[in-house]
Amino acid sequence: MAISRAQLAKELEPGLNALFGMEYGRYENQHSEIYTTESSDRAFEEEVMLSGFGAAPVKQEGSGVSFDDANESFTARYNHETIALAFAITEEAVEDNLYDRISARYTRELARSMAHTKQVKAAAVLNNAFDSTVTGGDGKELCATDHPLITGGTFANEPSVAADLNETSLEDALISIAGFVDERGLKIALRGTKLIIPRQLQFTAERLMSSVLRPATSDNDVNALRSMGMLPQGYTVNDFLTDTDAFFIMTDTPRGFLHFERTPLSTNMEADFDTGNMRYKARERYSFGFSDPRCVFGSPGA
């Protein structure tokens, strides 16, 4: 359906002081604080988790050396989605509007809608982090207490008891990250790099990260998180997170949160010969997801 003069009646009359409602600022590219962006030329992308060797055993004198096998553990798949939106304007609405270039106004609004959807899609990975029906390559949700290992054991990137963001829960999470193991149970050197929080926790995060002394105590102890340089990239607020007390710590895992761009954002405009309507369309294709769940440690909040 095209935007017609009936929908813009006030803009056809002289004496209108202002048009408003579409001049708000917008949250842009918050996904870049979390995701590494790569291009794609396929309908989907797959990444395979490899399993290396276990700990080397002792070889007894005169005995044969032990052999080990390498395997593929699981596959993470990124299915690209097509995101598109369009609008049309009648010839008469364009001709009779007295106040601005109506097409330019709604083209800007089209870009705003596309940008909003991208941020919602990016945040959905974290918003679904504790949902057992939304799983990654290993068959578990992003944050779980029982991610399976190929050796038969498990590892956890979620606390066994859900906790709110505070000094203790943050320190416990960083300790847990330092204890992560690979698919064969070997210790790996990972560290927390950045805290991801909803807007409701930004003041708590600032006190935890920036106070010289321990926050919320009368002790004269140093703030260990600050003095030890933990979380070197600080914290970032994501305004599209829906859980008001969940928090996440990103790690320096090589293949973690990924954003694949299949088709960059493009806009098109054409005239309909029969009606004279002008039609405008925006379209892009992309996917958001994660490969290695060791890329994050998350708590849903108490």
Question: PLM features: residue spans?
Answer:
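N-terminal alpha-helical "arm" segments
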Residues: 1-27
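Short low-complexity stretches enriched in small and charged residues
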Residues: 2-6, 37-46, 64-67, 89, ...
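Sequence/fold signature of self-assembling virion shell proteins
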Residues: 2-10, 141-183, 189-194, 200-302
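Assembly/oligomerization interface modules of large self-assembling protein complexes
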Residues: 25-83
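A generic local secondary-structure boundary/capping motif
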Residues: 75, 184-185
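Long, contiguous amphipathic alpha-helices that act as assembly "spine/axial" helices in icosahedral shell
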Residues: 75-133, 195, 280-282
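Generic structural "secondary-structure junction" signal
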Residues: 80, 96, 128, 136, ...
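Glycine-rich, mobile lid/loop segments that gate access to catalytic sites or pores
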Residues: 116-156
